[in-house]
Amino acid sequence: MKKAFLIVTALLGLSLAAVAQPKAVGLRGGLFGNEFNGEISYEHWFSIFDNDYDFLEAELGVFGGNGFKGTLIYNVTLVHPEFTDRGDWGLYIGPGVVTGYGTGVNNKDELKSFAFFGLAAQLGMEYTFWFPLQVSVDFRPSFMIPAWMNRSELGKNANRWCHFAFGVRYAF
């Protein structure tokens, strides 16, 4: 009985803590090379190691009009400067994973479909206004492993794996 009570109490406490954490949902995108990449973005902040500004970022999106991808990144806020009296600034960095499916041209100029997975990193800056709006700019290099590419073919598709983006989110 004590174990059941402790488990229920712990689960209730975790659910209340999850509800109390700040979140943001919106769009992230940019023009990379001659291709547009756009994503639906969700951020969930939480506290680990006494840092209240860590957040998990999950995104689903399209790239180049011929593929889709999903990204999950754990961001740690490096600095949280007080530049202004209102609003919050943050400079963050984090590792993550990415997976997806698309088409691309190999070194024989053949159009191929491919699935990919890989590791990503992110360095960015965001500003959350005193009203529920957040804007961000970030740089995200990714190391992808497409199923059909060999090492010489990675260069032709490099603009898909390293890019800058701008984000606009509703913070709640």
Where are these regions (language model features)?
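Short glycine/proline- and aromatic-enriched beta-strand/turn motifs that initiate or cap beta-hairpins
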Residues: 19-70, 169-172
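Residues that define the transmembrane beta-barrel architecture of outer-membrane proteins
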Residues: 21-23, 34-38, 66-70, 89, ...
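Extracytoplasmic loops and strand-loop junctions of Gram-negative outer membrane beta-barrel proteins
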Residues: 23-24, 106-107, 150-151
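Predominantly the C-terminal beta-signal and adjacent terminal strand-loop region
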Residues: 130-172
